[in-house]
Every structure is written in C-alpha cells, then in structure tokens.
Amino acid sequence: MKPTQFAMAGLLAMGVGLAAVPAAAQQRITVNIGSSHPTTNIWVHAMKEVFQPEVDRILKAGGGKYEVRWRENYGGTLYKFTDTRAAVRDGIVDVGMVGTVWENSAMPLQNVTYFTPFATTDHELLIQIFDKLNTTVPALRDSWAAQNMVPLSSLITDSYDIYANFPVRTLADLQNKKINAPGTSANWLRDTGATPVDGALTTYYTNIQTGVTQGALSFASGIGPARVYEVAKHLTRVDIGSMYFGSVATNKKFFDGLPKDVQDAFVQAGKATSKAHGEHVSKVAKAAMDTMKAAGLQVADLPAAEKAKWVNSLPNIVQPWLQATGENGKAVLKAYFDELRARGVKPLRDWDAQNR
C-alpha cells in the first residue's frame, strides 16, 4: 500500500472509530408541576406560560445536556387550595403554587403584609421585595426549608379596596354595614363601624345579591372575573394595599437532587416568572377595571382626611402576630418596612416603628 493510501485508510479507520463513539446522551428529568387553581388564575398563569418554557429555554441554551419532561397537574386535579403547602412539601408535585395566605398556623411569617395594611399599592414592587426577603432573611428562608420547600417566585394581589352596593364617602358610611372580609382582612375593618363577614371571591356575588353583606374588601383582578361589580356598583379606592400571597415553590428534597445546571435554570426561570406575574396582574387588573367601568361601576377615592382617620384609628393589629411569631416576626417586619422605605415607599402607617 502506498503511503498516501495507508494514511487515507488510517483516517477512514479513525473516522469509523469516531463515528462509533456516541455523543453525550441527553438526560431527561421528569418534573411534576401543578396547582389547586387553573392556569387562567393570576397566581398560576405564569407557571405555565413563563416558568416551564423559560426552564426549557435556559437548558437548551446551556448546551442541551438536560431536558425536562413536564407532567402538568393544574386546576386542582391532584389537590385543592387547602393543600397547596402539603402538596409541595410532601412531593405530590415537585413544583407548585403555595398559598401561604391559607397557612397562618404553619407559615405565619409569610403573612406579614396582611397584618400591616396601607403599606404599598405597588404589587410589582412587592414581588421584588419578597423575592429578596425569602432568600436573605434567615427566619423566612428557614421557614421555607422547615416545610421542605424552596421558594422560586413571589405571588401577590393587586391593591384591596371596597366594592359595595352603596357609596362610601366618609368612614361614617361604613357604620352598621356588613362587609365580606375573610380571614386576617377582617382586622382591616376594626373600629370602622363595619362588621366583617367571612367569604371568598366565589361567594361575594351571592352574599351581596341576597343581602348577607353589602360589599367586600377585594382587588380588581379578582372582582372582575367574579363579576361582583354586577351587584356592587360602587368602588371606593382606599388603598389598603397589595398583599404577598405566597410563592411558586419546589420541593426541597427534589431540588437538592437536581443537577446544578437544572437548579440554576429553576432559579433563573423563577426570576422571569416573578416579572411576568407582576406584569400579568397589572394587565388583568386594568382590563377588569375597564370592563367594570363600562358596565356602570362608579369609582371614587376616599378623601385623604377620611383615609387618614381610618388608618390611624386602627388598633395595633400587628401586635398579636408579633406575639405569636416572637423575634422572628420582629425581624421580618423590620426587613419588610426597611425594603419599602429603601425603594421610596412611604407607608401610611409605620407598623414597625410602633412595635420595636
């Protein structure tokens, strides 16, 4: 064989050998993702529309070594809203929407906003704050870990106001009125003369229609789809504020077992989900307000003097929460209000200052 033929044969042999070596196999990881609410819900929408595709995009951009196989369990197919914490904690799903608002006994620290009304109406800012607090405040971070969870993206409501079948021009207009204000929000009516009545977005319409109540404390992105404005024609803006609702979270044991690249993809996708969630709530709230106004909703602002009277007449409603949560609660309260002020927010009441 001539040298050139020998060299060519060698190269061909090498080529055959190289061809016989398979490329690095892509690792497929199954992720069970779910929620108690449908994907049309403001707290779930970005999970499906942003978190999942963003994880896929990041992994593909990183070389495609890993691929996620999503098993979707949205809309309460596996569990109801009362079980969002247990579902993620126990691994019924690997990633899920956790409504800490329903977990005041197991996760009280996360409910600080519900005990400190009139702090901020900027729900997009609130997302940024809690994305930070959940990972930097030891008490909050540890409380998630104690539940075998890692928070990835913060969930919020837009600002609460009064939707009623009567106008509210002064605080005196609330005297002897029954207002739907479930759970902790009942505290916001303390010493106003109104009587809080338990309920939910799914019951407000019937409650008001049948005279059980005359109105509800709620937010536009919820009231609009529930069509409560059909029986409550008056919206009084009082700026009770936006509330931290919970987080999209992942089961900690599951997360800790993921390859580092996939963990990083989850964290980065969580940040994108937070941004998209805030923008989506803004869009839904505006669309709801436009629809409600077109249907005849009368909108008015509570005069500043009357609002101040409401804010300052409230008893120290955060004190029982602080007594129950101790030093951890104080740390969370301080961190929350420090973040508000650092971002230019001036709370209408300094709940932290009066509870140092």
Give the location of each predicted region.
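Bacterial N-terminal signal peptides that target proteins for export
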Residues: 1-10
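Intrinsically disordered, low-complexity regions enriched in polar/acidic and amide residues
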Residues: 4, 25-26
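Sec/Tat signal peptide C-region and signal peptidase I cleavage site
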Residues: 18-25
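N-terminal secretory/targeting leader peptides
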Residues: 26-125, 140-356
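Signature of the catalytic double-stranded beta-helix
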Residues: 127-139
